[in-house]
C-alpha cells in the first residue's frame, strides 16, 4: 500500500510505459496472482531495478512534428529542402553543384574576341567549336549559362536575342560578338522556365535583316575585381530603327548598359563643322576667297603651314628707308637709304604700270580672290581697262551695293576684272620679273638686288634656304602675310625674286583687317588639324600667334635665320 501512495510522486512517463508500470504494480499488489504464478515473485523482486531505470527527470515528450526531415529522408518536405541545383546540359563538361564559384576570378572587360573563341558562329546552337557540337538544351534540362535580354522598344528589333553560351571553367569574361544574326528557336530559351529566376523573354520567329553593324551593341557587366558568378551572363543590346541604321566605326566603344551612352550614327568631325561655320559667318566682301580656297588640291594633304612676315623677316626694306638698319649694323646711311629709295621706286613703277595700283589703291583687298565671285568670266584679251570708265576712288571695295555707278554691280564686275588681270600677270612673270621691265630697268634691278644683298650681309639668301627647304616638302607650304597693301606687296615679291616661293593664292594683306583676322582666314582655309608656325619680327604677329596658340619664331638678326634653317634641317619644324 505504501508503494501505491508513492505513485503520484513519480515523474510523468509515456503512455505505453505508464500502462506497463500499472500492470506491473497491480500484479505485485495482488496476492492471489502471486500465489498462482511463481514468476511474479521474481518480477516483484526486480521492481526496485525497474523503478531506477524508468525514473528520468529530464525526459521531455515530443510530437511527431518535432522531428526534422533528416530522420525521415524518405518523405519530401518542400518547405525544408532547398531547390534542386541546376546542372549543366553540355556533354563532356564537369558537373557543378552550386551556382556560385568556389574561387573568385577577376573580370577583365575586353572589346575583342575573348580567350580563343572563334569570331563567327561559335556562340550559336549547332555550330561546332573545339570541344564538340553544342547541343540545344531540352526543356527537361537546365542550362547553367544563359543570356537574358530586355526589350527597349515596342517595335521588332533585330538586336534583342536570348541564346545559350558555352560555359567556361576558369574565367567569367564579357562576351561581345559581331557575328551574323540568326533566328533562334524558342525551345532553346524555354528550358529556363522551371528555374527560380527572373522573367525571361521568349523569342518569336520574326525575320530580320542579315547583318547589322556591331556598333549598335553594348555589353553590360561588372567592371571591378570582385568575385563574379559564371552561371548567368546578362547582355543588353541597344539599337536604332533599321531604316536609319548606319555604321559608325569612329564612335565605337564599350557601353556601360546605359542607352544614352551607346554609340549611334556617325557625326561630322569638329574640324569640318568649324570650317563650314566660319565660312558661313564671313562677310560679303570676302565671298571671292572661297574660289581660291577650292583651287588648292593639296590642302587636304598638308601637315604644316609656315606663316611668314615679309619686311624685316624675309627681306630688308623698311629699315633701309628709315636708316635703322645702317645704324644697327654700322653701314653707310647714305648708301643704305639710297638703295632703299631705288627699290621703292621700282616697286611702285611695277604696281602702277602693270598691276593697276592707281585704280586699286582705294579698294584694296585682303586676298586676290576676294572679288572673284563678281567676275562673270568675260574674255579680257581685247578688253580696254583705260576706257571702261572704272574709278576706284569711291568704291572702297564695298559689296552688295547697287546704288549709283560706284559700288554697283557693273562697278564690282570691273573691279573683279582688274584683280583677275593682276593674277594673270603675276602667274606669268613670277619667275621672270624682267619681262615687265625694259632692258635698262632690268639691268638696274639686277644691280640693285646684288647691292642690297651685300649691304644686308646676305639676309635674303639666308632666308631663302629655309623657304626652299620648306617648299621641297610635299606636306608643307609657305604663306605670306604682310602689312603692305596687296598690290604693292605683289610687286615687292616679284622684284625680290620670291614669286616661285609664294603663289599668289598664298599671299595675304593685313592692311585692312590686321594679322589676327588674317590668321583666322588661313585657319579656316587649311583647317585646325594642320600645325601652324609663325615666323616674324613684330609684336603684331607674335600677339596673333599667341591668340591662336601657334608657335612663334622671332627673327631679329642673321643668327635667328641660321637657327631657323638648322631647326628645319633637323626636322624640328
Swiss-Prot record:
Organism classification: Eukaryota, Metazoa, Chordata, Craniata, Vertebrata
GO biological process: anatomical structure morphogenesis; cell differentiation; double-strand break repair; negative regulation of extrinsic apoptotic signaling pathway in absence of ligand; positive regulation of DNA repair; response to ionizing radiation; visual perception
Modified residues (N-acetylmethionine): 1
Subunit structure: Interacts with SIX1 and DACH1, and probably SIX2, SIX4, SIX5.
Primary location: cytoplasm
Family the UniProt entry places it in: Belongs to the HAD-like hydrolase superfamily. EYA family.
UniProt entry tagged with the keyword Transferase: no
One of the record's GO cellular component terms: nucleus
Bias kind Low complexity: ranges: 254-271
Protein name per the record: Protein phosphatase EYA3
Co-factor: note: Binds 1 Mg(2+) ion per subunit.
Native source species: Homo sapiens
